[in-house]
Amino acid sequence: MQFERISTEQKKLSLIQTFLHQNALKLDEQIEYFVVGYNDNEQIVVCGGLAGNIIKCVAIDESLRGSGVALQLITELVDLAYTLKRPHLFIYTKPEYATLFKSCGFYIISDANPYVVLLENSATRLQKQCSLWEKMRVDGNRIGSIVMNANPFTLGHRYLIEQALQQCDHLHLFIVGEDASQFSYTERFEMIQQGIFDLSNITLHSGSDYIISRATFPNYFLKDQLITDESYFEIDLKLFRLHIAQALGITHRFVGTELNCPVTAEYNRQMHYWLMDAEMNAPKINVIEIPRKTASNHIISASTVRKHLAEKNWAQLAEFVPMTTLNYLQKCGRF
């Protein structure tokens, strides 16, 4: 079979989209490259895409299923990823297709049955990462954690961190690693690093592929947005409780209350269930919701900060972010 690598800027994208629709899939807009395979009539019969380090939109013509062409396709996609220096790969798929990808060298690391399973191309990488986290473990009765995007870092983020530190012996701070925000991962990490420089008893972790970003979670094979969101919540929170929290000895997770975004509010509710109530082979984690900090009678949020930044409302911006963020934005030419 002849394979071809296609960037999403090429005209052939419409043919790929048609083929995906024929296989009950939608085109995922985050895909940067496709690998497609043609039959003797130069018709697309297999395809798969690469978005960052996630393989997406794998489709195989019904006539070729079970023929071994899936292994050829995945091999081509893995070769492409290695060429792009992306050796650590993930696949989200329906549970009924997990066996297919396991035969291609992928291993299940989390699931949201009966809708989604998450696989990666290593049998030991997650275990090795947990071993690294175990070396960062800090003794204490109350070990806290926060996961944040910080797009950008605001006084609200700083307040949440301060409140958490008052309630625990040590705090682990995780940053969502994907570059799917207005500010890049590097920018967000540096703003947080500068914004907490004066605080002690805190470990700032670099971005991890095992902190799942909602922005990169696929929805191309799930028809219902509610099911997509709930599957994301489950996969992300189970990874956190079963692996990250166990390795670091985390006992508490802190989060700001959410009044404006229904999806984030539901994530907070699901957090109580998956971290505290659900029965699984891992200690329960106490979820603590901290009321959001306000400025001028308005809740401080990163979205409001981005709005002030876009509208060049410098005075209002200064009320919502610490001086370290202001200095960083100015240094980077954001205002």
Swiss-Prot record:
- Indicate yes or no for the key word ATP-binding: yes
* Superkingdom of origin organism: Bacteria
Q: Which residues form the N-acetyltransferase domain?
A: 1-131
Which catalysed reactions does the entry list for this protein?
A: holo-[citrate lyase ACP] + acetate + ATP = acetyl-[citrate lyase ACP] + AMP + diphosphate
Q: Which GO terms describe its biological process?
A: biosynthetic process
Leader sequence range is none
SMART domains noted in UniProt: Citrate_ly_lig
EC numbers: 6.2.1.22
UniProtKB keywords:
ATP-binding, Ligase, Nucleotide-binding
Q: Note the SUPFAM superfamilies from the entry.
A: Acyl-CoA N-acyltransferases (Nat), Nucleotidylyl transferase
- GO function terms (MF aspect): [citrate (pro-3S)-lyase] ligase activity; acyltransferase activity, transferring groups other than amino-acyl groups; ATP binding
Return the PROSITE patterns for the record.
GNAT
List the PANTHER family hit by this protein, alphabetically: [CITRATE [PRO-3S]-LYASE] LIGASE
Q: In UniProt terms, what function does this protein have?
A: Acetylation of prosthetic group (2-(5''-phosphoribosyl)-3'-dephosphocoenzyme-A) of the gamma subunit of citrate lyase.
Please identify the protein, giving its name as recorded.
[Citrate [pro-3S]-lyase] ligase
